[in-house]
Regions:
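Active-site loop/lid in soluble adenylation, ligation, and acyl-transfer enzymes
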Residues: 1-129
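Short histidine-centered catalytic/ligand-binding loop motif
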Residues: 37-52, 138-161
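A short glycine-rich, hydrophobically flanked beta-strand micro-motif that places a catalytic Asp/Glu
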Residues: 72-77, 81, 174-189
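Conserved metal-phosphate-binding beta-hairpin within the catalytic cores
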Residues: 99, 180-200
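An exposed, glycine/acidic-rich loop-and-rim segment of catalytic or binding clefts
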Residues: 119, 123-136, 142-150, 219
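Phosphate-binding core of ATP-grasp and ATP-grasp-like enzymes
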Residues: 121-135, 166-179, 203-204
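A long amphipathic alpha-helix within ATP-dependent nucleotide-binding catalytic cores
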Residues: 149-181
Length: 226
């Protein structure tokens, strides 16, 4: 098993069977010691965050597989904080697909002159480039085509899948009395050039509230999974 990439919140290994092993860490994104799923840097470490992230990811990927939504998920080992997944090629050098139900985070920081913080949004969809030095800028459909990162058809499929997946997650959280404010996903292409959901779905890449109270990732895991 060879280490091929050290990420902010996960280490990635190549397996002999051709698949990939993801090792979840206790590091989470944020700034100045405060967790923020929209940040592009590790802000702090929380004991148990890796295990909580894997448990949530396992739960949501199994739900998506039940709905025949394509993902890279193969299996997981909660005791070792690892998940085996199929190989996938990312779009360009990596994109993040964001669905927003409230005007918070970077959306509000960008558009605060035009909208009040917390204003409901109807599943607003946007894409950002994974580029720490550039601050993960947003990218338009036209720019994706111009740079040959994704085709127009792929863009529409990615938008449709993002809204479908996030809608399912939002409904599950609603059943627990929780409100999804925003969430970011990642997609790639499998060996047959089919778009599939990759990476993870956990409290570390979403903002969830109960009333006016923000629910931090570890507590969210317990509220969703018990």
């Amino acid at each position: 098993m060879d280490l091929i990439y050290k990420g902010k919140t996960k280490n990635i290994y190549a397996l002999e069977n051709g698949n990939i092993l993801m090792k979840f860490k206790d590091d989470v994104t944020g700034k100045d010691g405060v967790f923020d799923p929209g940040e592009n840097q590790v802000g702090l470490s929380i004991d148990g965050a890796g295990n909580a992230g894997l448990r949530m990811t396992e739960f949501f990927f199994n739900k998506l597989n039940e709905e025949n939504i394509p993902t890279h998920y193969v299996s997981s080992n909660v005791d070792e904080n690892t998940m085996e997944v199929k190989k996938a090629r990312v779009f360009g050098k990596g994109l993040e697909f964001i669905c927003r139900y409230r005007a918070v985070g970077s959306f509000y920081r960008r558009y605060g002159k035009y909208i009040e913080e917390g204003t409901p949004l109807d599943g607003f969809f946007e894409i950002t480039i994974k580029d720490d030095e550039a601050g993960d800028p947003t990218i338009s459909k036209d720019c994706l085509e111009t740079l040959k990162i994704a085709t127009a058809d792929q863009y529409e499929e990615l938008k449709k899948l993002t809204k479908e997946i996030c809608g399912l997650i939002r409904d599950i959280l609603k059943e627990k009395g929780l409100d999804l404010y925003d969430i970011k996903l990642e997609f790639g292409l499998d060996e047959n050039d089919k778009v599939i959901l990759i990476d993870e779905i956990s409290g570390g890449n979403m903002r969830v509230y109960k009333g006016d109270e923000y629910i931090e990732p570890l507590r969210l895991t317990e509220m969703v999974l018990g």
